[in-house]
Amino acid sequence: MTKKNIKILGSGPTGSLLALNLASKDCNVILIEPLEEKDLLSKDKGYAITQSSRRIFEKFGLWELIEKSAYGFTTLSIMDQEISSSVIVRANDLKKINDNQINLGWVIDHRDLMKILIDAINGNRYINKFKVDSIDDKTFDFIMAADGRDSPSRKKWKIPYLKRFYNQRCISFKAILKGAPKKRAYEIFRHQGPLALLPLKNCTYQIIWFSSISDTQNTLNLSDD
C-alpha cells in the first residue's frame, strides 16, 4: 500500500493528535505551525478526559505518560438548579468496558498535555514540522485544517458553516476551593448557563463559567478588593 502524504495545518491538541494517529499508520505527515513551542504551552486551562478519550490515548501509546500528569476524579456531582435536582455519578456507574477503572475521569493541565504531545511529535520519524506553509498543496494526498475556531483555512477554501449566537460568554480560570469532597468534579446547570468545576492538584479547580454577555462583563469588571 502506497504511503499517503498528508499536510496538517495547526498543532494544538486536535492537530497534534491527528498527526500522531496518521503517523501511526505510516503516513508521511507535514505539520504546519507558526507558533513557537513555548507559545503552544502557554494556555492556562485544563481539559477533562473521559474513559473514551483514555482508550484513544492508550491506542496511541500516550496514556501512561498522560495518566502521570492527570488528576483523576472518582465522583461527578450533576446539579440542575432549574428543577432543583441533583445526582452523583461514581466509577461503579461506568459501563462494563471500563469496570477496571477506579477513576470516573481525569483532568489535565493544557501545558502538561501539550508537552507530552510535542515530545511525541518531535520523536516521530513520520512527522516533520514547518513554521511556514510553503510546500505545494499538489504534493499531498490530503490537507487537513486544525487551525482554530476562526479557521483561516476554512475561509480560504470558502467552506460554508453555520454559527449561532447564544448571547453567552465563558470565563475560564483556576481557583483554590477548600472544604469540597476530594476527587469530585461538578457540573451545574443554571438559568444563566452551565458551570463546571474540574479538580486539579492541591485543592485547585479549573472553573468553566458560562453566563450572559452582560453578566460576564460585570464579573470581569469587579475589583480585586
Please provide the spans of the model-predicted regions.
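Beta1/beta-strand and adjacent pyrophosphate-binding region of the FAD-binding site
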Residues: 1-12
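Glycine-rich FAD pyrophosphate-binding loop
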Residues: 9, 21-45
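Short beta-strand/turn micro-motifs composed of small residues
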Residues: 10, 33, 80, 175, ...
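N-terminal Rossmann-fold NAD(P) dinucleotide-binding loop
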Residues: 15-16
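Rossmann-fold NAD(P)-dependent oxidoreductase module
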Residues: 21, 120, 174
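N-terminal glycine-rich dinucleotide-binding loop that anchors FAD/FMN and/or NAD(P) in oxidoreductases
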Residues: 45-68
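Conserved N-terminal helical subregion
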Residues: 55-59, 69-156, 162-169
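Conserved FAD-binding catalytic core of PHBH/FMO-like flavoproteins
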Residues: 146-225
